[in-house]
């Protein structure tokens, strides 16, 4: 994986410079969508088929995107296809978002809850977490009933686990020690 990160870094940095000069949030959404499409197994098969020309691969990829694609994005996609790097887009997107977060003083927060959170609960939870972590958070929310109750939050390499499952595991360790 380190090798993929090394290869993807210059692409992410170049794309970030272009996005910063234009519409960073718009580019961020487009990069996320491109990464999602590039991660699809059919796109992988298409990109690695030697019988299909680069132009056809680029056109097919662009047509799979729902967002409008400007000239700069088309050039970026064409460059990735010509250099056989289209399937690197998920890693490029990860690094792009890390650069965006660093500039904004923000971080991605993965919030896993035992139950579905209402909009008000999520807003309150994010506000509390932003105070705790000292930066703006971009939350992604998932539900995992195995937590039994509470939430598990991952921000970068920090984990805050207030779930019932974690408490039970701590009690089990304490009792068996």
UniProtKB/Swiss-Prot annotation:
Keywords: ATP synthesis, Cell inner membrane, Cell membrane, CF(1), Hydrogen ion transport, Ion transport, Membrane, Transport
Cellular localization per UniProt: Cell inner membrane
NCBIfam families linked: ATP_synt_delta, PRK05758.2-2
Topology within the bilayer: Peripheral membrane protein
Gene: atpH
Free-text function comment from the UniProt entry: F(1)F(0) ATP synthase produces ATP from ADP in the presence of a proton or sodium gradient. F-type ATPases consist of two structural domains, F(1) containing the extramembraneous catalytic core and F(0) containing the membrane proton channel, linked together by a central stalk and a peripheral stalk. During catalysis, ATP synthesis in the catalytic domain of F(1) is coupled via a rotary mechanism of the central stalk subunits to proton translocation. This protein is part of the stalk that links CF(0) to CF(1). It either transmits conformational changes from CF(0) to CF(1) or is implicated in proton conduction.
Complexes and interactors: F-type ATPases have 2 components, F(1) - the catalytic core - and F(0) - the membrane proton channel. F(1) has five subunits: alpha(3), beta(3), gamma(1), delta(1), epsilon(1). F(0) has three main subunits: a(1), b(2) and c(10-14). The alpha and beta chains form an alternating ring which encloses part of the gamma chain. F(1) is attached to F(0) by a central stalk formed by the gamma and epsilon chains, while a peripheral stalk is formed by the delta and b chains.
Record-linked InterPro entries: ATP_synth_OSCP/delta_N_sf, ATPase_OSCP/dsu
Pfam families membership: OSCP
Gene Ontology cellular component terms for the protein in this record: plasma membrane; proton-transporting ATP synthase complex
Record's protein name: ATP synthase subunit delta
């Amino acid at each position: 994986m380190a090798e993929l990160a090394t290869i993807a870094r210059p692409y992410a940095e170049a794309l970030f410079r272009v996005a910063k000069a234009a519409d960073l949030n718009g580019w961020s959404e487009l990069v996320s969508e491109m990464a999602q499409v590039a991660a699809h197994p059919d796109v992988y098969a298409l990109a690695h088929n030697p019988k299909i020309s680069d132009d056809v691969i680029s056109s097919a990829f662009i047509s799979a995107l729902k967002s409008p694609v400007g000239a700069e994005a088309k050039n970026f996609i064409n460059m990735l296809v010509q250099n056989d790097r289209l399937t690197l887009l998920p890693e490029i997107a990860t690094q792009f978002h890390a650069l965006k977060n660093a500039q904004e003083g923000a971080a991605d927060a993965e919030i896993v809850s035992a139950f579905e959170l209402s909009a008000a609960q999520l807003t309150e939870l994010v506000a509390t977490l932003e105070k705790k972590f000292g930066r703006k958070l971009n939350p992604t929310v998932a539900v995992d009933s195995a937590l039994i109750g509470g939430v598990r939050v991952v921000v970068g390499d920090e984990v805050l686990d207030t779930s019932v499952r974690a408490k039970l595991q701590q009690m089990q360790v304490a009792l068996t020690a």
